[in-house]
């Protein structure tokens, strides 16, 4: 099944104050976030990728053009010829499509549609979130349904509380977001080709197309309480990077057993994740009074860290 990866959004500035890079190219261990997402799909046998590119397209394309299999695989040099003993992407097919800078996700999907061929089913992903969700089960459940799209539904990630306010502005209830019976869109989609007929020019995928289809009962959710983590904040990126460097990556199903301990509303965070989060929290606490940019990012100080 082909996999469309939406990797055309604007870049982000790293903690070290370096230049902006496309979010999918943020390093997680010794490989970009995008590589980890693709490796997850390849683990389940899905190795045809369509990259819907925009901002940072040159960096993304260059990374794969210059890909070095010996960077993370054992190899032999024989009479001057380098021969990797194992490979990561040698059997992948990657199509690179420029879809614009300011383009909404739905429009990006419209622009790569010709590359999907006549396949009845395909998958899509925001290319900036990692999980250990059972992809085979997600696909099987969707294929057996009459839905046009399926999305991974994860517990709320916010640590905030919500309040019930009456007409006199009195608070009648306070609730933790994490305990509410709601789910967030986890960014892992399975779709039928028919969905493409519902895409309108210049519209968003979730906010427009899937919202309308859900009202008609044509969108399926796969609730999942296991490991799921985006890379939207500095804290999240640091946690993912540290887990990868320590070889404790729950999402790396190709090299580690599936982490079956649920994460979310009803279960504690796995120890390896909690340990890293605690360390990052300590750093963030120490930066509480540090100078920040207009967008809230900490301006690094010469602190020796």
Where are these regions (language model features)?
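A structural signal for short hydrophobic beta-strand segments in well-ordered beta-sheet cores
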Residues: 25, 162-165, 221
């Amino acid at each position: 099944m082909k996999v469309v990866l939406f990797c055309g959004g604007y870049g982000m500035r790293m903690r070290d104050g370096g230049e902006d890079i496309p979010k999918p190219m943020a390093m997680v261990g010794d490989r970009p976030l995008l590589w980890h997402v693709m490796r997850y799909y390849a683990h389940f046998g899905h190795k045809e990728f369509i990259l819907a590119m925009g901002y940072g397209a040159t960096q993304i394309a260059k990374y794969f053009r210059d890909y070095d299999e010996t960077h993370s695989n054992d190899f032999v040099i024989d009479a001057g010829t380098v021969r990797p003993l194992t490979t990561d992407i040698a059997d992948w097919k990657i199509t690179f499509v420029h879809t614009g800078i300011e383009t909404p996700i739905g429009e990006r999907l419209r622009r790569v549609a010709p590359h999907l061929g006549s396949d009845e089913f395909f998958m899509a992903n925001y290319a900036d979130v990692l999980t250990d969700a059972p992809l085979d089960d997600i696909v099987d459940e969707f294929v057996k349904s009459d839905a046009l799209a399926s999305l991974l539904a994860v517990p709320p990630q916010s640590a905030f509380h919500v309040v019930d306010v009456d007409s006199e502005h009195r608070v009648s209830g306070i609730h933790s977001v994490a305990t509410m019976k709601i789910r967030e869109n986890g960014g892992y989609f399975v779709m039928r080709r028919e969905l493409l007929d519902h895409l309108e020019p210049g519209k968003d995928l979730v906010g427009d197309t899937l919202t309308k289809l859900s009202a008609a009962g044509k969108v399926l959710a796969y609730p999942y309480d296991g490991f799921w983590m985006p890379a939207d904040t500095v804290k999240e990126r640091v946690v993912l990077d540290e887990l990868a460097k320590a070889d404790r990556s729950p999402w790396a199903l190709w090299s580690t057993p599936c982490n079956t301990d649920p994460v979310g509303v009803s279960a504690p965070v796995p120890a390896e994740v909690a340990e890293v989060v605690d360390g990052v929290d300590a750093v963030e606490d120490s930066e509480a009074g540090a100078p920040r940019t207009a967008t809230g990012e900490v301006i690094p100080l010469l602190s020796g860290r």
